């Protein structure tokens, strides 16, 4: 089955500090409040990943996250689904989990 990460406040803070310039941290943290859905921390982590350290891209990701949170999560956690015909289902799940954890735990 597909890997579903558990994301904590500490994880979000760690990812922010790791992937974004220090001078942007307060601005980015202030945007977290706009995410009001059930999977809030998971969506914030996905936005951080998808934006790749770019604050403007992060803002764009976050601006659609409440309405399109599944797409946001899918882009971050399950990028191989778009190329599904190239892989077996097990390969897709294994590789997606591997790529997400590689980013999440570095």
Predicted regions and their residues:
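Residue-level signal for secondary-structure boundary elements
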Residues: 24, 28, 55-59, 70
